Amino acid sequence: MSQQYSRRGGGKAKRTQVDAEKKFKLDTLTELFPDWTNEDLIDLVHEFEDLETIIDKITTGAVTKWDEVKKPSKKDRQQKEPAGDVEHIHAGSAAAAFGASAQAQGAPASLQRSHHSAGHQNNAKPYQRQSKYSNSPRQGKQQHQRKEKVAKENLKPAGQPAKSTASSTSWAAMLSKKEDSKLQAPEQQLEEQPQAQSQAQQTEEPVAKESQTEKKVGPQPVAAPLHEEQDSKPKKMTWAAIASKPPKHAENASKKPQEILQNVQDLKKEINKIATEDTAVEHSETTVTHSEVGVNAQAEHESFPIEDGARSVGADDTYYAENVDATNEDAAATVNGNAPAASEEAAAQEDASNANANVPVSLPAEANHQASQQVSFGSEEKQQTPQQPSQQGGMHAGQHVVSQVPQSAQHSSQAAAQTSQQVASQAPQQQTPQQAYYQDTYTQQLPQQQAQAAQAQQYYMNQYQFPGYSYPGMFDSQSAYPVYNHQQFAVPQQGQPTAQSSQNSQQAQSQSQQQQQQQQQQQQQQQQQQQQQQQQQQQYGIPPGYVQAGELAAQSPASTHTQPQQQPQYGGYGMPYYFYQQSFPYAQPQYGMAGQYPYQVPKAAYNYYQPQQMSQAGNQATHQSQSSQNDDSSSASAANPQQGQQGGANSQQQSQAAAAQAQAAAQAQFQQYYQFQQQAAANQQGMPYGYSGYDYTSQTSRGFY
């Protein structure tokens, strides 16, 4: 006593701790095996301390749940009483055997202790509910079940469950039947409705046989209500039940492939006959509704999925080829001739016989599809007098449905075709003006682009020699060339600066020549400005036609979207380094391998629109110079003697022009050198490692050097 009291008093803290642990284990187990109840799991948790072993045993099937705790009906109880007596005797006398087997199993001490002290009431909570010898049905069952578990693991005659004694007492026989019983146990659950009707079921053997016969009889009209029940209320099935299904069917199905094929061929002939007879009737009777079809589907489980495009609906062939689906096999095994199985080629027949080998049970989920996608032809014998050949009725239903469905299918396909034609005719009309414009501009740009692409190729040539190396734009373009022919950076047109500088050198000639030259210069400056603007616009994606639009849009990169052919500027990465982090080895600015431009990116306040602002300043300067030139030229034509003044004006004007030129040249260079780097910085704004290029002072990139 003293020991017990001390255990009850001092062990309280420990016990709560243990309970918490067990609760945690229970939670995880219920998550993993949602179809196991707590009552099932509690005993496992007590029996094995390690969570992994429990999971292992459950998944391997070394441990099973209690049978369903459903209250048996009176008939069942009366049938099972003889067996039940044996069970209770067994459970009562089993204490010694159970203890021994538990030790042999190496079960933890807690289990043996619980068995030892089961009579006392001070045991841990779960055991207060189940004192060892209580006779209430559930606990008796549990007791018996626990023993059966042990028996399955170490097959000792002592721990044998009473079930086996009913059929054969030798444990060798039991061993050979172990697998059978594993397969049959889950099937018992599924077969419960049929079992309730059949009368002789004390032991498991009859159940197994009966389940086989049930399977064979299944699809015939007698068993129709059963199937309806199974479909209408989805049954909760254990994974074991699902997994162990196919073998039974495979047996049945392999017995009967020849019969099936004969049935199908007979059906074909009769279908041909009736199809010719009934074409007239058919059109008047296309009103069968889908709901009726659905009812037939459930009443008689023989469902044939429709293939819409298989045939056009003609006078004779209102039927069309159907693949015998996995779900059909039950039905096909016992086709009565009321269902038109429809014409199948020889290949389809072979398929059917092959498919018979592995037939899954059609689960309740499929019942939902039946109404919509599977037309099924039920047994129509209820509606007809038995003398009338059942063929006819089935055929009628079949034909209404068949004629109905393809017609609707045809309508929808026609409608779809019309709409697609309309869309197709509209689309080119919408696109043509834009396309024409862009094609024109691009054909104008082509020679220019090719020249630039060649230049860029040459410039980057050394980089193709290093096999593993890829420079930033390499995969951005869809053409073979890298991005440059899309004008993402503009190579300055050569030849303009040189021409103008030569003209500058000639400006010491007579004033009449000077005036002509000045006019030429004006034109050239205007051209140059336009070209620069075009370059910038192309570089930012504005088509070169919009000159003023450029200033309105402030040349922002967002206007890339006005030119569909251009690559998007920010998402520009090609696949190959989509996944690299955008840091030193793979990131942007390695343009010159040997470091031809030792530049650094300015810090965060960098202005991406600098070039545009410079060009605007240039515009203002040239406008001023133009206006002054106009005044000068008019005054010069009026009076020659004022040439001195005019010369002064000219010199001023020349200096202005020279400044504008210098600015333009500088700007072109700026574009060439810094455009890429600018783009790189912009590209990296969206990237995960936002290094702004090589800034050796910045905190972010310091680690890489």
Curated annotation (Swiss-Prot):
Main subcellular localisation: cytoplasm
GO molecular function annotation: DNA binding
Biased composition (Basic and acidic residues): 65-90, 206-217, 248-258, 299-310
Modification(s) after translation: Ubiquitinated.
Keywords recorded for this protein, A-Z: Chromosome, Cytoplasm, DNA damage, DNA repair, DNA-binding, Nucleus, Telomere, Ubl conjugation, Ubl conjugation pathway
Cell location: Cytoplasm; Nucleus; Chromosome, Telomere
The keyword Cytoplasm belongs to this UniProt entry's keyword annotation: yes
Stretches with biased composition (Low complexity): 91-112, 162-173, 184-205, 331-358, 399-438, 500-512, 624-656
Record field: compositional bias (Polar residues): 119-140, 614-623
GO terms under biological process: DNA repair
Region annotation Disordered: where it falls in the sequence: 1-20, 62-264, 277-438, 491-512, 614-656
A cellular component annotation (GO) from this entry: chromosome, telomeric region
Record domain CUE: where: 21-63
Subunit structure: Homodimer; may form higher order oligomers. Interacts with the large RNA polymerase II subunit RPO21; the interaction is direct and serves to bridge RPO21 to the Elongin complex in a manner dependent on transcription stress. Interacts with RAD26.
Family as reported in the entry's similarity comment: Belongs to the DEF1 family.
Function: Recruits the ubiquitination machinery to RNA polymerase II for polyubiquitination, removal and degradation, when the transcription-coupled repair (TCR) factor RAD26 fails to efficiently displace stalled RNA polymerase II. Also involved in telomere length regulation. Binds DNA.
Protein name: RNA polymerase II degradation factor 1
The species this protein was found in: Eremothecium gossypii (strain ATCC 10895 / CBS 109.51 / FGSC 9923 / NRRL Y-1056)
Gene: DEF1
